[in-house]
Amino acid sequence: EASFISGIEYTDNNLEKIAETLLKAGTSNVVITLGSQGVYMKNVKETIQLSGCKVNAIDTIAAGDTFCGALAVVCAKKEIDQEALNFANTAAAIAVTRSGAQPSIPTLDEVKHFMLEKELALSFNF
């Protein structure tokens, strides 16, 4: 979607150009999911790129929706930062390890447990 909205064809080397274009158009935060490769975020203060969680993917049908939902939950509590992106990235990673759409969406406890196993920080409370 970021490529379509910005009018710039996506390549591995032009994420920053796409993000800059969207920021200039008035967006506060640009978040681009990269599938198994992770997530890229840019705003006027910082740029963050996280690798994807290594999992055995079974069905990717709900990955994007799960990522967006998880990020929205965090954004209700705090600004987008590395911890927020890790939370959403983790939720999506868990989702792809299961079949189906709605049944694949993890619970909050499942995401917290996975993050703890992977030693990913989670300092905010829900």
Model-derived segments and their meaning:
Residues 2-6:
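A short acidic, helix-capping loop that chelates divalent metal ions and anchors anionic groups
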